[in-house]
Amino acid sequence: MINVRTLSEAQTHASLDRFAIGFDHRDRARLHELWDRVLDSERWSEGEMVAAFESAWGAWNELDAAAFASWSGAALAALEFAGVRGETILCPSNTFMATPLLALRAGAKVEFVDCNRDDLCMSFADFEEKVHRHRPRAAFVVHIGGHVAFEIEQIAELCRVEGIFLIEDCAHAHGAEWNGRRAGTWGDA
């Protein structure tokens, strides 16, 4: 483990370089032009640029798209739409704490579902058992590590059969595919 407190500035930059995300600096002028358009419009949300993003993102995913300022806002809107107040929501055990906390904020009771070792995503076997035990109104499935949950097809089918509102968290899997389908195409939100 690297202790950044004991490294020189040069050593710190060298250590962090391995985590650098590639950025083509030739795009800098275009990026700043787009930021200026947003700032000049004085519309941080629901403006021309957001509409353009929603259109492009929806076309790329072949889904309807609605942009939110944060995942939390989008998740709360989906939970409200699903009518979870007073109901149970199933949540994978391997997720950021915001997932169950938002369910609690929406007035739901949270039950956790174990995750598989091979994909670190929700286990269908445990999901099925929890569905029959708790009769949830909704469920979160979180695609972890840049790939789609390996058992998403079974999870989504059981949700359809049981009338469970399925919310896919695809923040870690933009563009990832499973059996020819992109992340985000199995759930209700």
Language model regions located:
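Conserved PLP-binding active-site segment in aminotransferase class I/II-type PLP enzymes
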Residues: M1-V84
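Acidic active-site catalytic centers that drive phospho-/nucleotidyl reactions
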Residues: E54, D114-N116, E168-D169
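Active-site phosphate-binding strand-loop segment of PLP-dependent enzymes
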Residues: L120-D188
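Glycine-rich phosphate-binding loop at the start of an alpha helix
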Residues: F68, S72, S93, M97, ...
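Conserved PLP-anchoring active-site segment centered on the Schiff-base-forming lysine
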Residues: L76-H134
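Generic structural signal for small/hydrophobic residues in well-ordered secondary structure
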Residues: W35, W57, A74, I89, ...
